[in-house]
């Protein structure tokens, strides 16, 4: 799979300020400040699927107690997340687990390029935060009825199932969650706009995610051993 300069989805790039209010950069700068002020055990980074998670009670129930930071920005692609992580959002912190959820907004890229962009994010995290265990959340199906974007996201997930096991400290969490019913439709009770999750939709994702995070946190006893010794 193409990486680096040959893959546009793997080239870090700040989001364009199309609307003219510079909100994207303001959010990034706030995240960089959070890195200086807080000590997260768990870091979430990605697009609106990450960002909106903190608006629901399940975030406060499952993830706030884990000292989690939410670095999600709506509309972000793999390129934007790469840029943010290269420019301060991995500095001054030492999280034990990093959750990555991005790729559904990479409309200009092929499935192969999107998967390569996600792999580039994992490789960057491994370089900057080698102690962290990484969880990549698979891309969700989207659209009320079957459509090409669903097929593309499914292909990204298939590619990641093959490629991520070759990288260190990372695992893919399947987020299918039974969102697509037997008739091929997605319910608005799970995704209110057939893309973004409702509270009930997030519950299907967050409960298994929380279980995996807890498992990984329990598997990082090395620091405790060194402090006890």
Curated annotation (Swiss-Prot):
Q: Which residues form a coiled coil?
A: none
Q: Which reaction does it catalyse?
A: a 1-O-alkyl-2-acetyl-sn-glycero-3-phosphocholine + H2O = a 1-O-alkyl-sn-glycero-3-phosphocholine + acetate + H(+); 1-O-hexadecyl-2-acetyl-sn-glycero-3-phosphocholine + H2O = 1-O-hexadecyl-sn-glycero-3-phosphocholine + acetate + H(+); 1-O-hexadecyl-2-acetyl-sn-glycero-3-phosphate + H2O = 1-O-hexadecyl-sn-glycero-3-phosphate + acetate + H(+); 1-O-hexadecyl-2-acetyl-sn-glycero-3-phosphoethanolamine + H2O = 1-O-hexadecyl-sn-glycero-3-phosphoethanolamine + acetate + H(+)
| InterPro entries from the UniProt entry | SGNH_hydro (IPR013830), SGNH_hydro_sf (IPR036514)
Give expression by tissue.
Answer: Ubiquitous.
For the modification N-acetylserine, the affected residues are: 2
Activity regulation annotation text: Beta subunit (PAFAH1B1) stimulates the acetylhydrolase activity of the alpha2/alpha2 catalytic homodimer.
GO CC field: 1-alkyl-2-acetylglycerophosphocholine esterase complex; cytoplasm; cytosol; extracellular exosome; extracellular region; fibrillar center; ficolin-1-rich granule lumen; nucleolus
The GO molecular function terms of this record are: 1-alkyl-2-acetylglycerophosphocholine esterase activity; platelet-activating factor acetyltransferase activity; protein heterodimerization activity; protein homodimerization activity; protein-containing complex binding
Active site per UniProt: 48, 193, 196
Q: What is its EC number?
A: 3.1.1.47
Tell me where it resides: Cytoplasm
- The protein's name in its UniProt record: Platelet-activating factor acetylhydrolase IB subunit alpha2
């Amino acid at each position: 799979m193409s990486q680096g300069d040959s893959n546009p989805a793997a080239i870090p790039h700040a989001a364009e300020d199309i609307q003219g209010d510079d909100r994207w950069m303001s959010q990034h700068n706030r995240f960089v400040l959070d890195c200086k002020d807080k000590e997260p055990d768990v870091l979430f980074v990605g697009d609106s699927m990450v960002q909106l998670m903190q608006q629901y009670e399940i975030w406060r129930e499952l993830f706030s107690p884990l000292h989690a930071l939410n670095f999600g920005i709506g509309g972000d692609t793999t390129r934007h997340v790469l840029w943010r992580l290269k420019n301060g959002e991995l500095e001054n912190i030492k999280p034990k687990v990093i959750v990555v959820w991005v790729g559904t907004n990479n409309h200009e890229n092929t499935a192969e390029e999107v998967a390569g962009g996600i792999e580039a994010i994992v490789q960057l995290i491994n370089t900057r935060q080698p102690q962290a265990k990484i969880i990549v959340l698979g891309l969700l199906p989207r659209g009320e009825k079957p459509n090409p974007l669903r097929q593309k996201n499914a292909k990204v997930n298939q590619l990641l199932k093959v490629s991520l096991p070759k990288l260190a400290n990372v695992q893919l969490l399947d987020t299918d969650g039974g969102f697509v019913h037997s008739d091929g439709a997605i319910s608005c009770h799970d995704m209110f706009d057939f893309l973004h999750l409702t509270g009930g939709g997030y519950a299907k994702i967050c409960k298994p995610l929380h279980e995996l995070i807890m498992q990984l946190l329990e598997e990082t006893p090395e620091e405790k051993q060194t402090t006890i010794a």
